[in-house]
Design a protein with these regions (language model features):
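Conserved serine/cysteine hydrolase catalytic core
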Residues: 43, 228-294
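Conserved alpha/beta-hydrolase catalytic His-Asp/Glu region
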Residues: 194-256
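Active-site loop/oxyanion-hole signature of alpha/beta-hydrolase fold enzymes
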Residues: 44-50, 57-63, 92, 102-140, ...
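Flexible "cap/lid" loop of the alpha/beta hydrolase fold
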Residues: 150, 154, 163-194
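Catalytic active-site module of serine/aspartate enzymes centered on a nucleophile-bearing elbow/loop
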Residues: 291-336
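An N-terminal hydrophobic leader/cap segment in hydrolases
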Residues: 18-45, 54
């Protein structure tokens, strides 16, 4: 791949905060119009015979630098901006933080044709880090980003100081469990129906155990604004392609092969499971059991440590940022 690095800091404006009950804003296909909490840079490269660009934040320490770097990988229904409070906590303690948007998501390119795989996304991320001068880092992944982080640690173990998984999806193999297959075309049709109301309903039910706080509305508006904007069709198509990737590329069977210090942070009220809506009721009732899945994953990963948040759901860093940040910093402090 041909690589070059273009640093283009965006002018920051007040962060979007529309209520999820209001008509969502209309953002561009690369989330134009939604301001990130720190300057955004662009990593430009060629992949699969096309030019692409990855957006990312590269935030320097505000506290005394400790010489360590943390990479934050977002989930499928999230963006790098969702790590806002985590970034602030990390840089205050002297860490350099990089938070990219993966290809197909948020402010990054959304190709019409791309062979999405976790190996490819890991390679893209690794190349970005090399260009940024990062040779070794702690990798933190949330939701789909947790699946990616696990693949990354398997693919580049020598470059990972720690692996920290925050309610990762992929702690079970849904297809092997019996969840029916869904075509990319069907995923796309489902994605085209996505709006602010459906996003909020899903997150409230699956992520937050039926509860809701006004501060979550901002993230609903961010996601809904992508679908409502002029690039909504391209956004839905990329979401369909990546849903197919997530469903068909399990990582749980490879957990025993991980050879890096690993910590799992598991909100116990999480019930996320890809394709649960297709599963027979009896099967669906067994999927996304994060209290059990977290324990099973910790047992499968050599030397893994489990941090359970009994009263939290899928996004501890959003739901209780101070508690999560304290736990994350404690885990990072155990690095050899």
């Amino acid at each position: 791949m041909r690589h070059c690095l273009l640093l283009a800091a965006l002018t920051l404006s007040p962060l979007a905060s529309a209520s999820a009950t209001d008509a969502p804003p209309r953002y561009g296909a690369q989330l134009e119009g939604f301001a990130y909490p720190y300057p955004v840079h662009w990593y430009r490269f060629d992949s699969q015979r096309q030019p692409l660009q990855m957006a990312y934040m590269d935030v320097a320490p505000t506290g005394t630098p400790n010489g360590r770097t943390v990479v934050l990988l977002h989930g499928k229904n999230f963006c790098a901006a969702t790590w806002e409070s985590t970034i602030a906590a990390l840089v205050a303690q002297g860490y350099r933080v990089l938070a990219p948007d993966q290809i197909g998501f948020c402010k990054s390119s959304k190709p019409q044709a791309y062979q999405f795989s976790f190996a490819q996304l890991a390679a893209n991320t690794h190349a970005l880090l090399q260009q940024a001068g990062v040779t070794r880092a702690a990798i933190v992944g949330h939701s789909m980003g947790g699946m990616l982080a696990a693949h990354y640690a398997l693919q580049y173990p020598q470059d990972v100081s720690q692996l920290l998984l925050v309610n990762p999806i992929g702690l079970e193999d849904w297809k092997a469990a019996g969840v029916p297959w869904r075509s990319v075309d069907d995923w796309y049709a489902k994605e085209r129906k996505t709006d602010a109301a459906s996003i909020k309903q899903y997150q409230q039910t699956v992520y937050y155990g039926g509860q809701w706080k006004p501060e979550y509305d901002r993230w609903v508006s961010m996601q809904a604004g992508l679908y409502a904007g002029p690039g909504g069709d391209r956004v839905a198509w990329n979401q369909a392609l990546t849903s197919d990737m997530v469903f068909n590329q399990p990582v749980v069977q490879r957990f025993p092969q991980l050879r890096v210090p690993t910590t799992l942070f598991i909100g116990q009220r999480d019930r996320t499971a890809i394709g649960k809506d297709l599963a027979p009721p009896a099967l669906a009732a067994t999927l996304g059991d994060y209290p059990a899945l977290g324990k099973r994953a910790a047992a499968a990963i050599p030397g893994a440590r489990l941090v359970a948040f009994d009263d939290l759901g899928h996004s501890p860093q959003v739901e209780a940022p101070q508690r999560f940040n304290t736990a994350l910093l404690e885990a990072l402090g155990t690095a050899p």
